[in-house]
Amino acid sequence: MVNVGCFLPTYSASGPIEPASVLDMARDAEELGLDHVWVGDHYLWNVGMLSPLPALAAVAAVTRRVRLGTGVYLLNLRHPALTAKDVATVDVLSGGRLVLGAGIGGDNPEEYRALGVDPGRRARRFEETAAAVRGLLAGSGEPYQGRIVDLPAFTMEPLPVQQPVPLWLGGRASAVVERAARGAEGWFPVWVSAGRFQAATDTVGTIRGDLSGFAFALNLFTTIADTREAARDAVSNHLATAYGLPFDSFERYSAYGTADDIREYLAPYVEAGMTDVVFNIAGPDPRGQLRRLAAEVVPALR
């Protein structure tokens, strides 16, 4: 069985962000039986975006069951102690439902420069920040001294409900897969082929020896429509606005068309070991598309 989630519209490629739509779609996802809901994270982007953990705190107040995820949280752009505090807060408010999807975010170095962070040391910074955050969330009370991150000994309160808060690492590089296998609970890429997914499954299996409890999750831009042509127009316009790149760069990694088209697209990922898929719904009427996906695509994944 594949767990299914969706991204919430905390950014908009077609006008102002509508706060009510974020909460309404979260309610929809829970009522439709989805397993988790997700929000993205960017400081500087082609369109505005809400900050992820405050947004999930609001979502926690209007849901009771679905997991709440960041997809993915840019750890390097924040102080680890403040990140740990916010993560613990959302986990407590939600009753232990948070999944911390985290990534380096190196595709946009302008975000680093705007916040005074050196993008040239992003891999080392990420490893140290993640380790420091996890130590604080576990209540270790130990100091953390790395090459970049240096924290004194202290114990944060309150601690999160979950021990540990699941950490899923975003990113396509082999180094990310290996890092996830050694120190996280999941891998959560975007824009990867089914073949790449299979290779990652093999790598994690070799390193861990046991895949049980490890999530192989796919962030998948998805558009469902009555025809493949209509869906292609919608997803290509959405991605061109949000990412400023031609659709040719994304097409092979996007699921679009009728329900049959999307089910066919997903099949090789399921075969490769995908445990979770998160529909990143592109195009108009995301709530309507979510209802169609839940009715026409999700049953084939259960």
Task: List PLM regions with ranges.
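Active-site-adjacent structural elements that line small-molecule/cofactor binding pockets in enzymes
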Residues: 1-302
